[in-house]
Design a protein with these regions (language model features):
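Ankyrin-repeat boundary/"N-cap" motif
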Residues: 1-12, 34-52, 85-95, 109-139, ...
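Ankyrin-repeat helical core positions
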Residues: 7, 26-27, 55, 71-74
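Ankyrin repeat domain, specifically the short helix-to-loop turn at the C-terminus of the second helix
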Residues: 17-32
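Short amphipathic alpha-helical segments that mediate assembly, nucleic-acid/protein binding
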Residues: 18, 59-66, 80, 101, ...
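Surface-exposed polar/charged interaction patches
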Residues: 57, 72-76, 107-114, 132, ...
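Non-catalytic, alpha-helical, charged scaffold/linker segments
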Residues: 57-99
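Charge-dense, extended regions
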Residues: 155-217
Length: 217
């Protein structure tokens, strides 16, 4: 439908215009498919993910329109993204490593570029590797991705390192990532690497400043 199409194509900058279009279409009895709420949630999620990249003026312009959109479609507002302040201890409240990873990602990983801390960058690297190796099948894999993967080895020995057996396990998994964009052990190996990374971050709650990286990804 025209309404669903407009919602699915919306970006942050077009939210005010989207509100006007939605109001017009709904006033003229636009047919609802049941998928509109999902798109509004997507729009809100994208807005919060990029909140840290927007100026305060841009947020002040777009956020009220986003709130109108939530109300218009009866959608619970997406929680505001709270970014790490750069100096407090890094903490999580969840119990499973998967949920802890998600919390660390939301807290420490910026919407674009490298993180400010080694902990955040280790989490970011795991996320990037999972997306490229599992979701994309390694189609974009190049020397820069390889360097990024190998850098994780150096991150996990900083501060309070993993114990010797865990360091060896992480190193073996990283060494099993080939220059063809494949990982020995597949999804299970990458999940274990991510679990070990989360464990290392939780052993190092104090922020470790990240130096300039040797990769651009």
């Amino acid at each position: 439908t025209p309404l669903l199409y407009a919602l699915s194509r919306a970006s942050n900058s077009s939210i005010p215009q989207l509100v006007a279009v939605s109001e017009y279409l709904l006033a003229h009895r636009a047919r609802l498919t049941g998928m509109e709420k999902e798109q509004v949630k997507r729009i809100g999620t994208d807005f919060e993910w990029f909140r840290d990249r927007m100026s305060s003026e841009t947020v002040a312009e777009l956020e009220p329109a986003l709130m109108e959109l939530y109300e218009m479609f009866g959608v619970e507002p997406v929680a505001k993204r709270k970014m790490y302040d750069g100096h407090s201890d890094i903490k999580v409240t969840k119990s499973s490593w998967q949920e802890q990873f998600d919390q660390l990602w939301d807290l420490l990983v910026p919407s674009c570029g490298a993180a400010s801390t080694v902990q955040g960058e280790a989490v970011r690297v795991c996320g990037r590797l999972a997306h490229e190796l599992l979701d994309n099948g390694g189609i974009n894999w190049d020397d820069d991705f390889q360097t990024m993967a190998e850098s994780l080895t150096s991150y996990l020995v900083q501060g309070e390192p993993l114990d010797e057996s865990e360091r060896a396990e992480a190193g073996k998994i990283i060494a099993g990532i080939t220059r063809a964009g494949l990982i020995r052990g597949g999804e299970d190996a990458l999940a274990r690497l991510t679990e070990l990374t989360v464990r290392w971050v939780l052993k190092n709650p104090g922020p470790l400043a990240l130096k300039e990286t040797s990769y651009m990804r």
